[in-house]
Amino acid sequence: NHAWYGIVSNLKTQLTENLNLNLGLDLRTYKGDHYRQISNMLGLNGWYETRRLFNQDHANNIPGTTVVANNTVTQYMPAEPWKTFFNSIDDNQKIDYDYSETISYGGVFGQLEYQKNNVTAFFQGAVSNQSHQRFDYYDYESKYSDSEKVNNIGFNVKGGGSYTFSEKHT
């Protein structure tokens, strides 16, 4: 299951006869749930699995400290394309992986443009941040299931201009 929400907005205004301002905003957020489930038991009554859970150091093989999880799966959802959008299975009936992810993005930009006679010039800048975090319900001990939230900040600044020598050349 995935859910995207967001807004993109733009404002363009003429400040003077020769000066235009363009401002924008882009906000988005995403929440996704990712897991695997059985679609056909192929005649079996159930599926049993044992797995070693990861700790805060992402290790699952330390003697004496490794936590083991056991899981018995008895439910399945037939692989019918349109039903997969709406089906829901109990957490203890998931196999292989089960995690959620949240991604958020925010950005603003602005551009100032000057134009008079044969001269045009502009200055543009933008800043954005994308953050993401994973919540692993399957492979980690519950107290370590939330990953660190990571932020990726970006920006740009540009400027430029042109002079028109004639109608055919700039």
Which residues make up each language-model segment?
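Short alpha-helical segments and helix-capping/turn motifs at coil-helix boundaries
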Residues: 4-10
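Signature of Gram-negative outer-membrane beta-barrel scaffolds
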Residues: 21-170
